[in-house]
Every structure is written in structure tokens, then in C-alpha cells.
Amino acid sequence: MYLAYIFFLFATVSAIPTGRVEIVFPSVETSRSGMKTVKFRALGEDVELKLEPAGDILAQDFALYNGNQEKQQSVNVESLRRRLYRDSANGAALLIDDDEQPPSIEGIVFSKLRISPHEWKEVTEEGKRAHQVEELTSDRDSYLSDDILIPDFQREMVSFTRIDRNDKCIVIEVLLVTDRKFTERCETNEALTEYVTLLSSVTEALFRQLDSGWQLRLLGIMTFTNETEPPLFEESKHPNGAYKPVFVNKINDYFRENPTSLSKNADIIGILLTRSMRDRMDDWYSFEGLAFGNSVCSGNKACAINAYEKAEQAAYNLAHEMAHSLGIFHDGEFYRCVPEEVSEVISCPNSNYIMGYNSGDNYGKIFRMF
């Protein structure tokens, strides 16, 4: 018997279409303390970021593993850790590579602007590298919505405070898993690790904008390939390659029956797919993410998202589904099937729309953090 309810996140076109685009030449200054200041002007705004190191999002023993639980040595974790920066006040999560000159910057700012190195690497201005800034937007023709399945409660709930790591905030420990198609999409292990790390950093930045007190800690990454991917992945697909929603049930059972140290320690196990999910192959809509509700209280840890090619866009899906796993509903919604103490511990203000729902008071406000 599965816990209480499952959230189905579906989209008609794309979760986060791209708005305005502009080429910028950001400056990067580093202080003796390790803080960085990044400045640029984009879309009519002067941007100044005061960035602090954010390598703590990676666990101390963070590593990349293959599907056989073998640690991969091809990734320089400490170098990656040093490149991670955040400015919580401005909703910024960035990967800054100082080894390249001029420095390259990739990530999100104000929770609504994506910045990345321009493909014309040789284009510079006064020693500054060209970058592209894209506005992430939502519109009425491209939105996310949910459906809910509510079976009976059969599992005893445990205290939400079990994930309190005695830190100043609540630390959510996460294991992210890639299907074989996602693994193949990344040219190298390093590229895959950078994508997943940036995905996690942007997801945390979105949570910080909600004043949630949540901090993510990425325990590790598990990558499946043709040789190691469990049969349940193919068994859960339609002929056109889209996953069936039952996939989340099956992958949840898989980690229950085949636990590893990472999966046992994780509060949430996120599965990164390269396809959406559909009830029927010819459905007009597709699920872009699925999650068990209140998984931190039940042991049903799995959630899955369609991980778009841009990590900054996929982060909206991951943040939405992880929030459901932690007991958050859509803005303005409440389900009586959820224990009262959970709903009181975690609440989502109506002014934040990462948990928006395309109906009622929140019509047209889907995934707007600004």
C-alpha cells in the first residue's frame, strides 16, 4: 500500500519557456575571503551579486557511482566544490570557472534569469567573456498542473524532524539517479556531474526564495547505463518511449528491495529522465514530474522528473516535486488526508508560485517566483 497520495505534474508544452535574451559581459572580482562579486547589466537591470562559496551542497563524501555502486574516479569533486557560489538574497546559484580566463559563469539569478557562457567563446569586451542571459517565464499556454491519487492511510507517520541535522536549517539529503538515456546525453562523467550539481544548486536557490529554511545536501549521483539499468525502466515505457506513471511505484520498490548506503541515508531519491510520463501513449498531456506526498514521513522516497537539457529549467520540476515529497501542496490548497502536524510544520505562502496551480486564484501564476 502506498502512502496517502501521489502528485502528478503535467505540462502541455514546456515547463519554463524562454523569454527575453541578451548578451552581457559580466565582471568577476574575488576578495581575499573567497567571496566573489559579479556585475553586469541585463534586460534593463543593473545586477550586482555578492556571492559566497556554496560547496557545502555536496556531501563530504560525495561521489559519482555507476549502476553497480562502483565509485567513478574521473570527476574532480574538490574542484567542482570550489566553483559553486550562491547569493541567497538575490536568488542566485552559480557555477563559476576561474580556471578559464576570462571566467565562465553558469546558473540562475533572481530565480528568473539564466546566465551561461555564449557559444562564441572568443568574443570578449575589455577582458570580459560574452555570456547569454535568458529570462525564464511562464504563460497561459504552457503550464504545469497536478492530479492526485488518494488511497487509504496504512503507514504509521514519523516525525518530520527526523531530517533535522542539528544545523541552523533543515538539511534534506538527496540521492539523484539518471536513467541510461540521460547518462548517454552527457558526453563525459564530468559534464554529467556538473549538470546534476547545478540542478541541485538552483533547486536549493528556489527553496531559499521561499524562506523555507531548507538546505539541500547532495549525497551522490548514481548513473544507469545499458549494462546496469534495471529492467523496470523498459518495462515501464510505452512503445513511443514515454514512461508510464507506474514507473515511480516500481523504482520506489526497487530501492526498498535493493537498498544501498546512499539510498538508505537519503531523504529523497530523485530520478532524472529524458522523457515525460503519460497515462496513455496518445494522451494530449504529459507528466513532467511525479512524487509521493510526505515521503520523508513514510519511506516512499522516490520522485521522478523530466530533466530538460538545461539544468536551470529542470530545477523548477525538481523543486516542485521535492516540495510535494516534503508535504507541500499547491498554493491555496489543503488536503484533509494529510496529518495536521505536517501541514502546520510546512506551509507555502500564497505569494510564491513555485507551487502554483493553474486554477482559481492562482490561474496564470504557475511557477512564478517574481
Swiss-Prot record:
Q: Which SUPFAM superfamilies does the record match to this protein?
A: Metalloproteases ('zincins'), catalytic domain
Determine if Hydrolase is one of this entry's keywords: yes
Query: What Enzyme Commission number(s) appear in the record?
Result: 3.4.24.-
User: Is Cell membrane one of the keywords?
Assistant: no
This entry carries the following GO cellular component terms, namely: extracellular region
| Highest taxon of the lineage | Eukaryota
Q: Where is the Peptidase M12B domain?
A: 170-370
One Gene Ontology molecular-function label: metal ion binding
Alphabetical UniProt keywords: Glycoprotein, Hydrolase, Metal-binding, Metalloprotease, Protease, Secreted, Signal, Toxin, Zinc
PROSITE patterns xref list: ADAM_MEPRO (PS50215), ZINC_PROTEASE (PS00142)
GO annotation (BP), single:
membrane protein ectodomain proteolysis
Kindly state the tissue distribution recorded for this protein: Expressed by the venom gland.
Q: Which InterPro entries does this entry report, sorted A to Z? A: MetalloPept_cat_dom_sf, Peptidase_M12B
Give me the glycosylation sites of this protein: N226
Q: Which cellular compartments is it found in?
A: Secreted
Residues in the active site? E321
Q: Which residues form the signal peptide?
A: 1-15
Question: Which Pfam families does UniProt cross-reference here?
Answer: Reprolysin_5
**Where Zn(2+) is bound, by residue?**
H320, H324, H330
State the function annotated in the UniProt record.
Answer: Metalloprotease that may disrupt the cell matrix and the process of clotting blood or hemolymph.
Family of this protein: Belongs to the venom metalloproteinase (M12B) family.
Protein name as catalogued = Metalloproteinase
List the top taxonomic levels of the source.
Answer: Eukaryota, Metazoa, Ecdysozoa, Arthropoda, Chelicerata
